[in-house]
Amino acid sequence: MLVFIDADTILPKYFIQSFENRVNEKHFQAGSFTQKMDSDNLAIRAGAHFMSGYMRLMQYTPWPIGFGCLYITIEAFNAVDGFDESLYIMEDYDIILQAKRAGYKIGIIKMGCLASDRRYKNNSLHQILRGIYGELYRYTHGLRITKPIYEYNMGGEDKDNSKDTDPSKQKFK
């Protein structure tokens, strides 16, 4: 099993044991983990809760999604040729969709991984609107976004370099 976890995520104490138990119990072959947002801001925490619920709902549709923390069997990863590097954004959504289309069992596991709010602290409304726009774009222009639809700074890069957003230097509350 391959597990991909965002750099700014803290895993629960018994993550590996719990993860293995849930995957083996349900026979999941690809999917994602729910996340909680480490934030003092109620709106940011509520947004993360909504997105976890949305992700869990989408696993039962023809268009499952996963983000932040993903898992996939090596067999499924190879069958879908891994992450598609031609995608501009949402490659994590795409690999889960491709695994489902290839016949692999998808599951969203409720794990309580703790994610940093660093991307949302200063521009949460902007981030939320971009996320909604990205979702609407996917469903109206095809599920694969291969061209820039908005500016996206990978890994928390700050375009004006006025503050350090390196995830390895972030502190959790």
Per-region residue spans from a language model:
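Hydrophobic helical membrane-anchoring modules
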Residues: K100-K173
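Short beta-strand-to-loop acidic/aromatic patch adjacent to the donor-nucleotide binding site
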Residues: M1-I10
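Short aromatic/basic micro-patch
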Residues: Y71, I89, G107
